Amino acid sequence: MEFIDLGLIPHGEAERIQLERLKQVMEGTAEDALYLLEHPPVVTLGRQGGLENLLISEEALKAMGAEVVQTARGGNITCHYPGQMVVYPVMRIEKRRGGIKKFFFDMEETAIRTAARFGVQAARSEGRPGVWVGPGKLCSIGIGVKKWITYHGLSFNVSSDMKLFDAITLCGLHGAHPTSLSREAGKEISTEEVKNVFREEFGKVFTDTAVAAS
């Protein structure tokens, strides 16, 4: 597993990088990769749609410096912005016990353990994907799979500035609202800090031999 920090990168460029790596993994010319990054403001739609859950016009969204993008991930509508850590694992799961369901569970587990490292008690919520702190959604998960290789992944709210979420009905769940690690911890935490911890916890959850690569 190679860990790659892409910094702040547009959604389309990150998707291109994922698909290129997915092809390489499929062909056996590259190892699995975990991409950690942030996106400029963007609202993304999953395979379940979600445009009906955009609460403002696309023109108004553009005035906020954001756009709407259709993706191949699972799930409904969500948003990304600087101050939110995004994690895209491109990895084979065909030989992992439990398949896609276990992969999904382990991604949630990694996020829960990461939050705990900062003193925040997060948990799963039955019937509602992702990771929650009480009624607040800390982390959204939506993956794509091609020939048992994953792409897309997870977004983890770090900064307390989450105003872009005001433009959507989060994941199409009426009454759901976002929260962030900084808000729950009562102090501002940087995405760089969270990336480092997430990478460590991912290694513990998914494999005993994961080694970070620059």
Swiss-Prot record:
UniProt pathway: Protein modification; protein lipoylation via endogenous pathway; protein N(6)-(lipoyl)lysine from octanoyl-[acyl-carrier-protein]: step 1/2
Domain called BPL/LPL catalytic: residue spans: 28-210
Gene field: lipB
Major localization class: cytoplasm
Organism the protein comes from: Maridesulfovibrio salexigens (strain ATCC 14822 / DSM 2638 / NCIMB 8403 / VKM B-1763)
Reactions listed under catalytic activity: octanoyl-[ACP] + L-lysyl-[protein] = N(6)-octanoyl-L-lysyl-[protein] + holo-[ACP] + H(+)
Lineage: Bacteria, Pseudomonadati, Thermodesulfobacteriota, Desulfovibrionia, Desulfovibrionales
Localization of this protein: Cytoplasm
Binding residues annotated for substrate, in chain numbering: R73, G74, G75, N76, I77, T78, C79, H80, S140, I141, G142, G153, L154, S155
Protein name in the entry: Octanoyltransferase
Keyword RNA-binding: no
InterPro entries: aa-tRNA-synth_II/BPL/LPL (IPR045864), BPL_LPL_catalytic (IPR004143), Octanoyltransferase (IPR000544), Octanoyltransferase_CS (IPR020605)
